[in-house]
């Protein structure tokens, strides 16, 4: 897909795949404000929004696993991991569980959680891209979102 560069804000000239993998909180905040207007950018934002909430676990048998998002007492995301879907969840553990990787979780749960977006991107780099030190270039970000196999839609 030919992605449209932003023409506003702190991520001007970046495409939405880059933005959501750089700062998911900012992306979802802008979606909530309908900041992407109409036209191509709005369509792309809607598509990226759906994809970013449904990233498949890159496992041979993903139905046996789920993503655990662990929060501190203040509602800030502190850790993300993959756990066995059959494990017993302690009541009131401060965690939420999802079938897929959902980049919107830090924004949806902790509205003022500036660090949560980075926590989830670090997890994504480690677990999906298998490289904590990877630089998520324009090409890598766009190729990731262009590949439907990465998403459970």
What residue ranges belong to the model's regions?
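Accessory DNA-engaging acidic/polar modules
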Residues: 1-153
């Amino acid at each position: 897909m030919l992605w449209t560069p932003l023409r506003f804000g702190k991520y001007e000239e970046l495409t939405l795949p880059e933005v959501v993998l750089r700062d998911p909180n900012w992306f979802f905040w802008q979606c909530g404000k309908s900041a992407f207007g109409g036209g191509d950018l709005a369509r792309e934002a809607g598509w990226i929004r759906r994809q970013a909430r449904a990233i498949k676990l890159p496992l041979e048998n993903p139905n046996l696993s789920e993503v655990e998002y662990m929060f501190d007492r203040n509602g800030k995301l502190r850790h993300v991991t993959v756990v066995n879907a059959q494990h017993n969840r302690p009541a009131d553990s401060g965690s939420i569980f999802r079938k897929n990787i959902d980049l919107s979780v830090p924004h949806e749960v902790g509205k003022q959680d500036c660090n949560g977006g980075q926590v989830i991107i670090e997890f994504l780099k480690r677990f999906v891209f298998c490289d904590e030190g990877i630089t998520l270039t324009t090409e890598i970000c766009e190729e990731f979102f262009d590949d439907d196999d990465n998403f459970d839609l």
